[in-house]
Every structure is written in structure tokens, then in C-alpha cells.
Amino acid sequence: MPRTITIKGTGRADIKPDLIIIRLSVGSTDKNYEKASDAASERVTALKAALTGAGFSEDALRTSDFGVDTRYESIRDKDGNYRQEFAGYNCVYRLTISFASEPGNLSRAISAISSSGAEPEISVSFTIKDTTSAYTEALTNAAMNARAKAETLASASGASIGTLISIDYSDRRPDLVSPTNFRMADEAMPLMAAKCTVPDITPENINVTDTVTFTWEII
């Protein structure tokens, strides 16, 4: 039975975000389904028009999800008892727009969205276009880390490493998103409509970490 050494290598990559993704949610509620649907659609149209007017392409705003559910509200009757009463159909569009993380782009997009009158819920995330390169860099560093540790331990024991016997790796690939948060209360939307009030942000780098386990023969 050959002597072996098994080492877990850890690799990291520190990546600067180059892509901004804005996720929006707009909707409308009405007891008449057609009215609810039309009102929600009008908000989407207003968003597209505002973003196009700000210089973004006509197909920049994409629909990621459309849903319809029913809403009920608690009504107290004359006897003091509560009952559920139909409040209407709630039609909701979930949308995304992504663009390069360059000076002025975020400010331009938020200003356009805020001035559209659609009053969407907004979340902003900072990520990267080329995720493959980020994962590859982390994996390469993990392999180098494992080999360096194996060579150090073998040398300290008066031996050296030989043939690579096995590699054990679980491909987990977490989302590559900067920890920087961009939060905006609904009350701030009218203020954000003024371009001068929207700050440009330099987000924190994205830290990618991965691990791989290697087994070598000891000679």
C-alpha cells in the first residue's frame, strides 16, 4: 500500500464588480382583473419609457416573473365578528435591468426609475459579467495552496510528493455579489428623481473562496 498525503487547499479571488443589476417589482390591485392587469402593465410601460429616455436600450428592461394572486381583507360585521372579504386581484411584474458599472450609469437609471411615476420596489446588486474567470482563479489558487502545503509537510518529514492520486471537489459556486447594499425608502423616490441627488457608488470587491482536496503519493 503506497504512502499518501491528503491535503485540502483553499483558494481565494478578489474581484472588482463590473456589472450592476437592478431588480424592480411593480403591481396593481383591483376587484376587476382587467383593470388590475392594465394598471400594472401601464406602470411597466412607464418604466420602459423613462429608461429609454435616459439612454438605455428599448429591451434593457426584462420581465423575470409575472404573477397574479387574490387579496382579502378582514372586515368586522355588526356583531363584532371578523370575516374575510375579497379585496381584489393583485397583478405583479418583477423586472430586471443590468448595465456596466461605470460612472453615471447607476445615477441615470435610478433617476429615470424614480421619475417614471411607476413607484416600484427596488433592489440593487453589484456583480460581475465573467463569473467563470472568477471561479477559475479561486480554483487555481486552491490547487496551488494544496500543493504548497503538501510539499512543505512532506519535506519536513524527510520525503517528497509523487504522483497525484485523486482530486475531490464539490462544485458549489455561490452567487458572486458584492456585500455593498443600496437601500432606498419609498419616500426617497421623489428626491431621487433629481439627478443631482443620486450618488454614484464604488462597491466593495467580491470575495470568492473555494476548496479542493488532493491526495498525492509520498516518495
What is each model feature region?
Residues 1-219:
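Short, charge-dense linear interaction motifs
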